[in-house]
Amino acid sequence: MSTVQVPKLNTKDLLTLEELTKEEIISLIEFAIYLKKNKQEPLLQGKILGLIFDKHSTRTRVSFEAGMVQLGGHGMFLSGKEMQMGRGETVSDTAKVLSQYIDGIMIRTFSHADVEELAKESSIPVINGLTDDHHPCQALADLMTIYEETNTFKGIKLAYVGDGNNVCHSLLLASAKVGMHMTVATPVGYEPNEEIVKKALAIAKETGAEIEVLHDPELAVNEADFIYTDVWMSMGQEGEEEKYSLFQPYQINNELVKHAKQTYRFLHCLPAHREEEVTGKIIDGPQSIVFEQAGNRLHAQKALLVSLFKNVEEPS
């Protein structure tokens, strides 16, 4: 560990990327790149991370469990439905009890307010593994992926096309924080949350970022360095079939990407529905880096875990 220092974060928890400064984000990314090259660093020897899941997961569960093992600790899976919290115990009581047993909590659930309460009532770090409003760990991995490709955020344009969902929200805050240009194109009625857009615009004024929310996908991807999409229907929305016709013009396909830079890279948080939000030719093509992006979830989260756990041990 002589080459890279553990980032000092001015927060106990990570609930949204709004809580981190640009400098903290960059230091986390650089630390994640170090950990990617040095997988077996036992920096969390004997530490236990509780993993609370109310939503199905592949990448989040496996990357957090594998990350804790590689760091010398242990990830403990806790099904939200099987815990007493799922049978009426308050979030506050759950937070206080878990703080007696384990060293940190990662929670993947529906209500962002529940995660905020869990963090407020816990004496240990709480990480938002996804809520209906935010997906900060994904955005951190996305920034890492972009940084590995470009070694900068200055002058980089990220175009997000599709549903203005939790992933979009976290990317807006992330782009604003690091001073990147981000355009969002959604159908009318599916724009990102207005309050989150306002927050991103306010941050952008301080960092020099550009944030645009549009309805024209061609305009959004014009001269883009990175094109990003997500599924049109998030978990719990599967009955909204009428969305398909509205979203069809927002599919990432050969026609749409002609408007981006020739050297563009394609991003997707996965799971993907081929021939819906993206064609197979794009996601499986040479300019797609979605699996490198998925791999970076592991490394970005390891950097975050070490930083948050060390902050508890050595408070500033």
UniProtKB/Swiss-Prot annotation:
Q: Does the keyword Cytoplasm apply?
A: yes
Question: What does the entry give for GO biological process?
Answer: arginine biosynthetic process via ornithine; citrulline biosynthetic process; L-arginine biosynthetic process
Query: Which UniProt key words apply to this protein?
Result: Amino-acid biosynthesis, Arginine biosynthesis, Cytoplasm, Transferase
Lineage at the top is: Bacteria, Bacillati, Bacillota, Bacilli, Bacillales
EC numbers, comma separated: 2.1.3.3
Question: Quick one: signal sequence residues?
Answer: none
Q: In which pathway does it act?
A: Amino-acid biosynthesis; L-arginine biosynthesis; L-arginine from L-ornithine and carbamoyl phosphate: step 1/3
Q: Which organism is it from?
A: Bacillus cereus (strain ATCC 14579 / DSM 31 / CCUG 7414 / JCM 2152 / NBRC 15305 / NCIMB 9373 / NCTC 2599 / NRRL B-3711)
The residues that the entry says bind carbamoyl phosphate are 57-60, 84, 108, 135-138, 269-270, 297
Gene name linked to the record:
argF
Q: Which family does it belong to?
A: Belongs to the aspartate/ornithine carbamoyltransferase superfamily. OTCase family.
Q: Which domain of life is it from?
A: Bacteria
Root EC class: transferase
Q: Which InterPro entries match?
A: Asp/Orn_carbamoyltranf_P-bd, Asp/Orn_carbamoylTrfase, Asp/Orn_carbamoylTrfase_sf, Asp_carbamoyltransf_Asp/Orn-bd, Orn/put_carbamltrans, OTCase_ArgI
An example of a GO molecular function for this protein is: amino acid binding
Q: What is the protein's name according to its record? A: Ornithine carbamoyltransferase
Instruction: Write down the chemical reaction(s) this protein catalyses.
Output: carbamoyl phosphate + L-ornithine = L-citrulline + phosphate + H(+)
Q: Name one Pfam family in it.
A: OTCace_N
Cystines in this chain? none
Q: Relate the protein's function as given in its record.
A: Reversibly catalyzes the transfer of the carbamoyl group from carbamoyl phosphate (CP) to the N(epsilon) atom of ornithine (ORN) to produce L-citrulline.
Query: Where in the cell?
Result: Cytoplasm
Where primarily located? cytoplasm
Q: Cellular component GO terms, alphabetically?
A: cytoplasm
Which sites bind L-ornithine?
Answer: 166, 230, 234-235
